[in-house]
Amino acid sequence: MEAGGLPLELWRMILAYLHLPDLGRCSLVCRAWYELILSLDSTRWRQLCLGCTECRHPNWPNQPDVEPESWREAFKQHYLASKTWTKNALDLESSICFSLFRRRRERRTLSVGPGREFDSLGSALAMASLYDRIVLFPGVYEEQGEIILKVPVEIVGQGKLGEVALLASIDQHCSTTRLCNLVFTPAWFSPIMYKTTSGHVQFDNCNFENGHIQVHGPGTCQVKFCTFKNTHIFLHNVPLCVLENCEFVGSENNSVTVEGHPSADKNWAYKYLLGLIKSSPTFLPTEDSDFLMSLDLESRDQAWSPKTCDIVIEGSQSPTSPASSSPKPGSKAGSQEAEVGSDGERVAQTPDSSDGGLSPSGEDEDEDQLMYRLSYQVQGPRPVLGGSFLGPPLPGASIQLPSCLVLNSLQQELQKDKEAMALANSVQGCLIRKCLFRDGKGGVFVCSHGRAKMEGNIFRNLTYAVRCIHNSKIIMLRNDIYRCRASGIFLRLEGGGLIAGNNIYHNAEAGVDIRKKSNPLILCNQIHHGLRSGIVVLGNGKGIIRNNQIFSNKEAGIYILYHGNPVVSGNHIFKGRAAGIAVNENGKGLITENVIRENQWGGVDIRRGGIPVLRSNLICFGYSDGVVVGDEGKGLIEGNTIYANKGCGVWMMSSSLPHVTSNHVSYNGLYGVAVFSQKDGSSELPRGHRAQENFSEDGDAILWETELEKEDDPLRRPITIALVESNSINHNGASGLYVQSSEALHVITNVIHANGDRGITVAQSSQPTRVANNSISCNRQSGVKVEAQCKVELRGNGIYDNRGHGIITKGDSTIVIENDIIGNRGSGLQLLPRSDTKVIKNRIHSFRAYGIAVRGRAKALVQENIIFQGKTSKTIFQQISNNRECIMQNNKFLVFKKKSDTWRLVNPPARPHLENSLRRPSAAHNGQKVTAMATRITARVEGGYHSNRSVFCTIL
C-alpha cells in the first residue's frame, strides 16, 4: 500500500463489503494489507461472527453483552471447531501408495424438504456417502422409526435456529457425525433423541427439548452453543466429552449425568478434543506475583523468663509500729483506706491500668515524703502478629489486618501445592465450561467413579448445582453457584476432587455439603450470604478447606458434626450471623491459622461431644465470645490469638474438660477466660429442630455411620481435669479469669495482666481450683479474689502491682503457699470474715497498705512467711479484732533500718518459676486424623452475663 493511496478509514469501509474468502486473499498481499485486515476486528469480523448460523455470540449464554477480546479470533475458533468431526477423513482412505494418484471424491450436498431432492431425512441418509452434507430446509421432520447412522455425515438446518425441527430417535453406528442448527424433540416411541456408543458426535447451535441424549464410552462428543430444555445428557464411561457455551433450562432431574470411570479405550477424536482443550484459554489465573507471607501465629516471643526481684528502700524511719495499731485519721494512708469497698476489696480510682515494667513509685505522695520503689520487671503480654495490630482497638476504626494475614490468590496457592496444580490442569471424563444451568432441579451429577471438570459456569435457581458421589472426582474452577434450593455442591460416599476459585452464595442450604468419607480440596472460594451454613462437614466427611473467604452466612461459616473431620486452615471467616465455626455432635477437625472475625455469635463454638484441635487462629472483633466450649464440648485450644471480642475471650464449661493452652487473650469486652459448670439447657432441642430434619437428604432419614476411629491422635494429650495453662490473658474488660464451677479446675503458668477488673475471680468452686505458677500483674482491682464457700489452692504465683489487694478471700478452704505477693496497692492479703485460709511460705509486700489484713473473725494459719514492710505509716500486719482463730507461727518481718537497705528475692528467685513448666504450641499436624451434623443454632440474648450462659449465645 503506497503512502499516497487512500486513507485507512476509506480502505476499511471498502473492505467491509468483502466476503470471507476475499478477506483471506487480501491478507496475503503484503504485511500492510494483513494488518489492515486485522484492523477490521470490531466491524467486518464482528459481522461475520454474529451472522454465522452455526454459532452464537462468543460469550453466550453467560455474558452476551461482553465483547470478546478479538472477534476474528472467536470466528476462527468457531470455524476450526466445526471441522473437528472430519479430522479422521484421511485415515479412512486407502493407505496404499496408489491412493496418492486417486482423484479425491468431492463431498455432496443432499437437500431435504418439500420440493427438494429428498422428502425425509431417512431417505437422504439411505443415499448418503462418507462425509456428505445433508441440508434440511425449514419445516418439521418426524421420523416414525429409529434412524441408524451408518456412515459419517453432516446434518445442517437451513435458515434461522428454530425453523427446522426434527422429531426422531437417532442411533449412531459410524465413527463421526455433526449436527447443526436443528431443534430436536423426541419421537413418539422413545425419549432418547440421540445415542452413540463408540463414535464421535458434534452438536453446534442446536436446541433439545424434553428428551435424553446418551453417549457411551469409548464414544465422545463435543457440544457447543446449544440449548437444553428439560433434557438430560447421560455420559457413561466417556473418555472425554466437551460441553461449551450451552444453556440448560428447566430440568426435571439432572441436566448432565457423568457415570463410570473414563474408558481406557479411546476413539480417534480423543486426541483432537484434548488438543482443542489445551489450546483454548484457561480459567486458571496466570498472574506472576510474589507469594504473600503465610499466616504464622506460632512465631511468638518467649512468654517470660526467670528474674531476680529487688526491693529497694529509700529513706529512713524507726522500726515497725505495733501490729494492732491503725493509721492516723488525717494521714494520706487513711484516705487510701477509704477506697476499700464494703467487702474489703480495694477499688482503684485511677482510670488506667499499669502496663509498665516498674511498680508504682508513690505517685500520689508529696515530693517531700519518702519514696519506695520496687525494681523488678512485671511480666506483660506476649507480642504476637508483629507490632501494633494487637494494641487497644479504636472505636469505629476500620479493621486493617497485617500483610501476613492477607489471603493468597488461587495462582499462589496452586504454585505452592503441586498436586493441586496438576489436578487443576488435568482433563478427564467430561469438561463443562462457560455453560448456564438454571431454573431446574439438578445441574451436574457425577457418580460411580465418574470424572468431570467444570470451568466458568453459572448454576442458578436449581435444587442443587453439583452432586458427586460413589468415589467420583470433580474439578470446579471459577463457577458461580447461587440461589439453589438445597446445597450448592454436595459430596458423599467418598467423593472428592478440587473446588477452587468459585463464587457460592445465596443458597438455601450449605454452600458445600461434605458427607460420608468424602474428601475434597476446597481452595480459594468465596462462600457467602447463605441462608444456612457456608460449609457443612458431617457423617465422617473429611476434606481440606483452605484459603477461602466465608462470610455473611446465616448460620455457622463452617459446621462440623457427626464425626466430620476436615482440615480447616488459612481461611477468612467473618461477618456471619451465627458462629464462625461450630463443632457439635462428635465433630472433630484440625482448625488452624484461620482469621475468624466479626461474627454475631462465638468465633468458634464447640458443644455436644465436639472435640476439635483449634490452633494458631486469630479470633477477633466478634460481637459475642471468642471461643465457646459448651455442654459436653471438648478439644484442644492452643496457640490462638483471641482479641477484641465484645463478650469473653473464652467461655467454657469445666465439665467438658477443655484444654486451653498457649493462647493470647486480650482486649475482650468481658472476661478473658470464663469457666462455668451449670447446665444451660442446651441439650434439649425444640420440637421441629431435630438434626435429622435439618440435614436430611431428599426427605429420607439419615443413618450415620457410628464407627469411630481409634483415639490415638497425637495432637491431643488426655486430660481428666479442665486445664487453662500457659496463656497470656491481658487487657480484658472484666476479670482475666472468672471461675464459677462445681468441677475441679487447674490454672497453670498463665500471664494474667492489666485486665479491667481482677486478675482471677473465683466466685464458685465446690471442687478444688488449683492456681499455680501464674504471673498476675497490673490488674485494675485485686490480683485474686476468692468468694465464700470456695476451695482454692494458690501455689507458686507471682502477684505483682495490682491496683487492689494482692489476694482477697472469703473462701472456707483457701491455701496460699509459696507465692510472691509484691507491690500491690492494697494489702498483700485481705482475709475477710468467716474465711478459712492457710498462708504458708509466701513473700509478701505492699507499698501503701498492710502485708496481711485480717478482717473480723477470719480463721487463718499464717506460717513461715517473709513479710516486707511497705509504706512507713503502715504496719506489716493488721488484725481488726482480737481473733484467737488467727494463728501466727515462724513468720519473718523485715523493716528497713537505713536508706541503703536492699532486699532481693533470690532464694528462690522471683516467682513464678516457669522454666520447666512452660509449654509451647505443638507443631502443626498436616495429616488428616481428625473425624463427621450439628443441631441448628439459635441465638438468645440473656438478660445478664452471670446467668452462667455464654453472652448472646446459646444452643437451643
Curated annotation (Swiss-Prot):
<dbReference type="GO" id="GO:0006915">
    <property type="term" value="P:apoptotic process"/>
</dbReference>
<feature type="repeat" description="PbH1 16">
    <location>
        <begin position="787"/>
        <end position="809"/>
    </location>
</feature>
<feature type="modified residue" description="Phosphoserine">
    <location>
        <position position="321"/>
    </location>
</feature>
<dbReference type="InterPro" id="IPR011050">
    <property type="entry name" value="Pectin_lyase_fold/virulence"/>
</dbReference>
<dbReference type="GO" id="GO:0016567">
    <property type="term" value="P:protein ubiquitination"/>
</dbReference>
<dbReference type="GO" id="GO:0005737">
    <property type="term" value="C:cytoplasm"/>
</dbReference>
<dbReference type="InterPro" id="IPR051550">
    <property type="entry name" value="SCF-Subunits/Alg-Epimerases"/>
</dbReference>
<feature type="repeat" description="PbH1 4">
    <location>
        <begin position="449"/>
        <end position="470"/>
    </location>
</feature>
<dbReference type="InterPro" id="IPR006626">
    <property type="entry name" value="PbH1"/>
</dbReference>
<feature type="repeat" description="PbH1 8">
    <location>
        <begin position="561"/>
        <end position="583"/>
    </location>
</feature>
<dbReference type="InterPro" id="IPR022441">
    <property type="entry name" value="Para_beta_helix_rpt-2"/>
</dbReference>
<feature type="repeat" description="PbH1 3">
    <location>
        <begin position="427"/>
        <end position="448"/>
    </location>
</feature>
<keyword id="KW-0963">Cytoplasm</keyword>
<feature type="repeat" description="PbH1 12">
    <location>
        <begin position="653"/>
        <end position="675"/>
    </location>
</feature>
<dbReference type="GO" id="GO:0005829">
    <property type="term" value="C:cytosol"/>
</dbReference>
<comment type="pathway">
    <text>Protein modification; protein ubiquitination.</text>
</comment>
<keyword id="KW-0597">Phosphoprotein</keyword>
<dbReference type="GO" id="GO:0006511">
    <property type="term" value="P:ubiquitin-dependent protein catabolic process"/>
</dbReference>
<feature type="domain" description="F-box">
    <location>
        <begin position="1"/>
        <end position="48"/>
    </location>
</feature>
<dbReference type="InterPro" id="IPR006633">
    <property type="entry name" value="Carb-bd_sugar_hydrolysis-dom"/>
</dbReference>
<feature type="modified residue" description="Phosphoserine">
    <location>
        <position position="326"/>
    </location>
</feature>
<feature type="repeat" description="PbH1 17">
    <location>
        <begin position="832"/>
        <end position="854"/>
    </location>
</feature>
<dbReference type="InterPro" id="IPR036047">
    <property type="entry name" value="F-box-like_dom_sf"/>
</dbReference>
<feature type="repeat" description="PbH1 11">
    <location>
        <begin position="630"/>
        <end position="652"/>
    </location>
</feature>
<dbReference type="Pfam" id="PF05048">
    <property type="entry name" value="NosD"/>
</dbReference>
<keyword id="KW-0833">Ubl conjugation pathway</keyword>
<dbReference type="InterPro" id="IPR007742">
    <property type="entry name" value="NosD_dom"/>
</dbReference>
<feature type="region of interest" description="Disordered">
    <location>
        <begin position="314"/>
        <end position="367"/>
    </location>
</feature>
<feature type="repeat" description="PbH1 13">
    <location>
        <begin position="717"/>
        <end position="739"/>
    </location>
</feature>
<feature type="repeat" description="PbH1 5">
    <location>
        <begin position="471"/>
        <end position="493"/>
    </location>
</feature>
<dbReference type="InterPro" id="IPR012334">
    <property type="entry name" value="Pectin_lyas_fold"/>
</dbReference>
<feature type="repeat" description="PbH1 15">
    <location>
        <begin position="764"/>
        <end position="786"/>
    </location>
</feature>
<comment type="subunit">
    <text>Component of the SCF(FBXO10) complex consisting of CUL1, SKP1 and FBXO10. Interacts with BCL2. Interacts with PRDM1.</text>
</comment>
<protein>
    <recommendedName>
        <fullName>F-box only protein 10</fullName>
    </recommendedName>
</protein>
<feature type="repeat" description="PbH1 14">
    <location>
        <begin position="740"/>
        <end position="762"/>
    </location>
</feature>
<keyword id="KW-0053">Apoptosis</keyword>
<feature type="repeat" description="PbH1 1">
    <location>
        <begin position="198"/>
        <end position="217"/>
    </location>
</feature>
<feature type="repeat" description="PbH1 2">
    <location>
        <begin position="238"/>
        <end position="260"/>
    </location>
</feature>
<comment type="function">
    <text>Substrate-recognition component of the SCF (SKP1-CUL1-F-box protein)-type E3 ubiquitin ligase complex. Mediates the ubiquitination and degradation of BCL2, an antiapoptotic protein, thereby playing a role in apoptosis by controlling the stability of BCL2. Targets also the receptor for advanced glycation end products RAGE for ubiquitination and subsequent lysosomal degradation. Directly controls HGAL/GCSAM ubiquitination and degradation and thereby decreases BCR signaling.</text>
</comment>
<dbReference type="GO" id="GO:0000151">
    <property type="term" value="C:ubiquitin ligase complex"/>
</dbReference>
<feature type="repeat" description="PbH1 6">
    <location>
        <begin position="494"/>
        <end position="516"/>
    </location>
</feature>
<dbReference type="Pfam" id="PF12937">
    <property type="entry name" value="F-box-like"/>
</dbReference>
